[in-house]
Swiss-Prot record:
InterPro entries the record matches: FKBP4/5/8-like (IPR050754), PPIase_dom_sf (IPR046357), PPIase_FKBP_dom (IPR001179), TPR-like_helical_dom_sf (IPR011990), TPR_rpt (IPR019734)
Reaction equation(s) it catalyzes: [protein]-peptidylproline (omega=180) = [protein]-peptidylproline (omega=0)
Leading EC class: isomerase
Origin: domain of life: Eukaryota
Complex and partners: Homomultimers or heteromultimers (Potential). Forms heterodimer with calmodulin. When activated by calmodulin and calcium, interacts with the BH4 domain of BCL2 and weakly with BCLX isoform Bcl-X(L). Does not bind and inhibit calcineurin. Interacts with ZFYVE27; may negatively regulate ZFYVE27 phosphorylation.
Gene (UniProt): Fkbp8
Native species: Mus musculus
SUPFAM superfamilies: FKBP-like, TPR-like
Protein name in the entry: Peptidyl-prolyl cis-trans isomerase FKBP8
Record GO biological process: apoptotic process; BMP signaling pathway; camera-type eye development; cell fate specification; dorsal/ventral neural tube patterning; dorsal/ventral pattern formation; multicellular organism growth; negative regulation of apoptotic process
Compartments in which it is found: Mitochondrion membrane
GO terms assigned for molecular function: calmodulin binding; disordered domain specific binding; identical protein binding; peptidyl-prolyl cis-trans isomerase activity; protein folding chaperone
Domain spans labelled PPIase FKBP-type: 110-194
Swiss-Prot/TrEMBL cofactor(s): Ca(2+)
Length: 402
């Protein structure tokens, strides 16, 4: 990201050539060195009037040279621990190259920081430089190596950070510059740290710009299969859209924010599906459908969530509604066909279970479990009633003869 207004590739973690979620399956402290004692500031010794014995018997020049040669040299100050192991696992380390000015402070979570970043591979190959990279600290807008190391720096400080690939671009890398599983060296200068924007005082266009930045970060995390961070970024985007405002907005701005909210909710649902958070995904889809009942992506994902929960009878009509809106969509066709087969298998299993419960599976018709379940009890009931009535009549006849 070259500036705060328009984040560039490193800030947004975007993978070149990655789709922007249009499909259904895809979205869709360092110690200072000890200094020697400085005696220049001490007050002068008082004049005692008469020299002491030691003063009266000062050694000559040869003696002074001998004493100087035989005096042990002062022990050097212990070297400071240069590298800070940030997480204690040796995979993310930081060393101060240039300390910050005296009195400078460290940034806080939620502040907007601006850094000068130089990124290199372990062999020294420079792969990226950002003179003015701005991001919100703690919002996961950048790679974790930056988000974890910058809070330990003073404003004005320059530090070297070495990071394992898991805190950078992971197993996917970032083609064509950063190969998969690549550890990186980051030279970071913390230039400024300012409080984040007051959401209530943002104009409509400022809200749109902020929400779009968070959404793009979420898309980049999703492409790297980091669905937890993706969901976090989409949540932040939705918060920027839906938070209270003290600024009047035009109808066009409100409509633009609504469309952006729908996109973020759809992408959030996709991330929640990947994390198997079905109830949360169902809520996200339902919120989309409240605004846009014919939103195909929301219908598709809602049907898929219900299918994952085994609710095939509810999922199939929803997918059919989505297919009716877009009959040529092969993804919906395939999912619907799969669910129809699963429902048929589910019904077959239920029928077999009913037969087993009734204890006479051979006499029960497979196509009409309800009728078969009641046919035998009613026949026995009528037969037993007839026998009982016959017995009563016979008793009456015998009693009359007697």
């Amino acid at each position: 990201m070259a500036s705060w207004a328009e984040p560039s590739e490193p800030a947004a973690l975007r993978l070149p050539g990655a789709p922007l979620l249009e499909g259904f399956e895809v979205l869709d402290g360092v110690d200072d060195a000890e200094e020697e004692d400085d005696l220049s500031g001490l007050p002068p010794l008082e004049d005692m009037g008469q020299p002491t014995v030691e003063e009266a018997e000062q050694p000559g020049a040869l003696a002074r040279e001998f004493l100087a040669a035989t005096e042990p040299e002062p022990a050097p100050a212990p070297a400071p621990e240069e590298w800070l192991d940030i997480l204690g696992n040796g995979l993310l380390r930081m060393k101060t190259l240039v300390p910050g000015p005296k009195g400078s402070s460290r940034p806080l979570k939620g502040q907007v920081v601006t850094v000068h970043l130089q990124m290199s591979l372990e062999n020294g190959t420079r792969v990226q430089e950002e003179p003015e990279l701005a991001f919100t600290l703690g919002d996961c807008d950048v790679i974790q190596a930056l988000d974890l190391s910058v809070p330990l720096m003073d404003v004005g400080e320059t530090a070297m950070v070495t990071a394992d690939s898991k805190y950078c671009y992971g197993p996917q890398g970032r083609s064509p510059y950063i190969p998969p599983h690549a550890a990186l060296c980051l030279e970071v200068t913390l230039k400024t740290a300012e409080d984040g924007p007051d959401l209530e005082m943002l104009s409509g266009q400022e809200r749109v710009a902020l929400a779009n930045r968070k959404r793009e970060c979420g898309n980049a995390h999703y492409q790297r299969a980091d669905f937890v961070l993706a969901a976090n970024s989409y949540d932040l985007a939705i918060k920027a859209i839906t938070s209270n405002t003290k600024v009047d907005m035009t109808c066009e701005e409100e409509e633009e924010l609504l469309q952006l909210k729908v996109k973020c909710l759809n992408n959030l649902a996709a991330s929640q599906l990947k994390l198997d958070h079905y109830r949360a995904a169902l809520r996200s889809c339902s919120q989309v459908l409240e605004h846009q009942p014919d939103n195909i992506k929301a219908l598709f994902r809602k049907g898929k969530v219900l299918a994952q929960q085994g609710e095939y009878s509810e999922a199939i009509p929803i997918l059919r509604a989505a297919l009716k809106l877009e009959p040529s969509n092969k993804t919906i066709h395939a999912e619907l066909s799969k669910l129809v087969k699963k429902r048929a298998a589910q019904r077959s299993t239920e029928t077999a279970l009913y037969r087993k419960m009734l204890g006479n599976p051979s006499r029960l018709p497979a196509k009409c479990p309800g009728k078969g379940a009641w046919s035998i009890p009613w026949k026995w009931l009528f037969g037993a009633t007839a026998v009982a009535l016959g017995g009563v009549a016979l008793s009456v006849v015998i009693a009359a003869r007697n």
